[in-house]
């Protein structure tokens, strides 16, 4: 319930632009969000393993 409320609060435009912060579009996690994709590292990893992110593959060297 608290996470849903935070997501709703995040969707509103803030009074001042400095109050805006990134949040994962899938799970709502506020930390470790990749700006390019708009999702957190955990969701990114899951989607990358499933092959749902085009052009992304596991690095190996």
From Swiss-Prot:
GO cellular component, one term: small ribosomal subunit
Single GO biological process annotation from the record: translation
Alphabetical list of SUPFAM superfamilies matching this protein: Glucocorticoid receptor-like (DNA-binding domain)
Binding site for Zn(2+): 24, 27, 40, 43
Disulfide bonds: none
Molecular function, one GO term: zinc ion binding
First and last residue of the signal peptide: none
Annotated family: Belongs to the universal ribosomal protein uS14 family. Zinc-binding uS14 subfamily.
Subunit description: Part of the 30S ribosomal subunit. Contacts proteins S3 and S10.
Summary of the function given for this chain in its UniProt record: Binds 16S rRNA, required for the assembly of 30S particles and may also be responsible for determining the conformation of the 16S rRNA at the A site.
NCBIfam families, per the entry: PRK08061.1 (NF005974)
Protein name from the UniProt record: Small ribosomal subunit protein uS14
Organism (species): Clostridium botulinum (strain 657 / Type Ba4)
